[in-house]
């Protein structure tokens, strides 16, 4: 959301997600709600828009329940997925709730933090996320389609 006061810290270049889509076994789904989905310059073959099916937080929870893991910045979705026990990869986390000395969260045992080394520099955390997904994708076979009842 470009109008958010902390947008610089929360907006990740979409092409970094496209790189993740190239990992064998990885399928990307967007939970972004609102008219700005067209900002995503990744082809529909690489990312599926679930945001158009989401009308409330219950729908969001149902969509998250269908995912193997969630990659998000510090938003309500990070807290929802963490509370649901879903693995969460959080690439930027300087907020006090995320501490500074660990890659985990005392509140959400399934959450793993991938920290930037420099403000606004996303390549390092996404390289680490990519490495983590490579390991995870060899352990799990994914279905072709994700469907939930919204």
What are these regions (language model features)?
Residues 1-150:
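Catalytic machinery of carbohydrate-active enzymes
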């Amino acid at each position: 959301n470009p109008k958010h006061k902390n947008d610089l810290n929360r907006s990740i270049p979409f092409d970094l997600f496209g790189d993740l889509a190239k990992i064998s076994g990885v399928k990307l789904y967007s939970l972004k709600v609102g008219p700005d989905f067209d900002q995503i310059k990744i082809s529909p073959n690489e990312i599926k828009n679930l945001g158009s099916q989401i009308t409330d937080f219950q729908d969001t929870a149902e969509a998250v329940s269908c995912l193997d893991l969630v990659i998000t910045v510090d938003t309500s979705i990070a807290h929802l997925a963490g509370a649901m026990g879903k693995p969460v990869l959080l690439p930027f986390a300087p907020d006090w709730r995320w501490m500074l000395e660990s890659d985990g969260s005392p509140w959400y045992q399934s959450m793993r933090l991938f920290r930037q080394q420099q403000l606004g520099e996303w390549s390092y955390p996404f390289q680490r996320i990519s490495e983590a997904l490579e390991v995870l994708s060899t352990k799990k076979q994914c279905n072709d389609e994700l469907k939930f009842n919204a």
